[in-house]
Amino acid sequence: DETXTDEEFN
């Protein structure tokens, strides 16, 4: 599961 927003992944 992805427990973060796109901002954290970018």
Curated annotation (Swiss-Prot):
Keywords: Apoptosis, Disulfide bond, Glycoprotein, Plant defense, Toxin. The keyword Glycoprotein applies. Glycosylated. GO terms for molecular function: toxin activity. One of its GO terms (biological process) is defense response. Heterodimer of an A chain and a B chain; disulfide-linked. Significantly inhibits growth and induces an apoptotic response in HeLa cells through cell-cycle arrest at S-phase. Exhibits highly cytotoxic activities against cancer cell and non-cancer cell lines producing IC(50) values of 0.15 nM for human cervical carcinoma cells (HeLa), 7.71 nM for rat pheochromocytoma-12 cells (PC-12), 11.20 nM for human breast cancer cells (MCF-7), 15.80 nM for human leukemia cells (K562), 2.79 nM for African green monkey kidney cells (Vero) and 3.92 nM for normal Madin-Darby canine kidney cells (MDCK). This is Malanin chain B. The lineage of its organism: Eukaryota, Viridiplantae, Streptophyta, Embryophyta, Tracheophyta.
